[in-house]
Amino acid sequence: DKQYEVVRALDRRTGKEVWATEWKGAMSVPFFAAANGSWIRSTPTLDNGELFVAGIRDVLVCLDADSGEIKWQVDFAQRLKTSLPSFGCVCSPLVDGDHVYVQAGGGFTKLNRATGDIVWTTLDDGGGMSGGAFSSPVIGELAGTRQAIVQTRERLVGVDLESGKELWSVDIEAFRGMNILTPTIIGDRVFTSSYGGGSFLFEISKTEGGSFKTQQLWR
């Protein structure tokens, strides 16, 4: 059914279905992307008995992993009054302690894990054909500061976990904004790659005044 998305849990030993949960939330993508399908593109995240699923129509659903019961559901377009991403939501949810992070709702969004309430949203992508990031975020320590590292359609950005403030940013060139790779943290360095734009290694440091500084080591 093209109007619904379905998540199924299977017994690993037998392959039999344990539970199935569905919600209304499907959409069609532009014709040139249709070959990749018009269904969920992100990878679900399982953590401490809870399953977090990002649906293609910019929704985030939290389910009980044992029963499949929906604990909460956020429709970002409805709640934030943002337009749907033309290619659908692609980012996989990132769980960190009491919060969930995802590139949805026209930017990078932090939610309360227990309730689904939005804490903040940042990195406004402007929506339309250039909106809806493809990359999934990571969290790590760079230059002594724990932060989220987020690759948008156009940039690689360090984001403060408490406030959502941008800590640093570098432009990442990619054909039609197809920045898909999840960044990799190596010490105080970040590796990433883009479609048609090459591979990059950046070093993140701080000045004597405490502001962040980026240096491209190679491309």
Where are each of the predicted segments found?
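Noncatalytic, solvent-exposed loop/strand surfaces
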Residues: 1-219
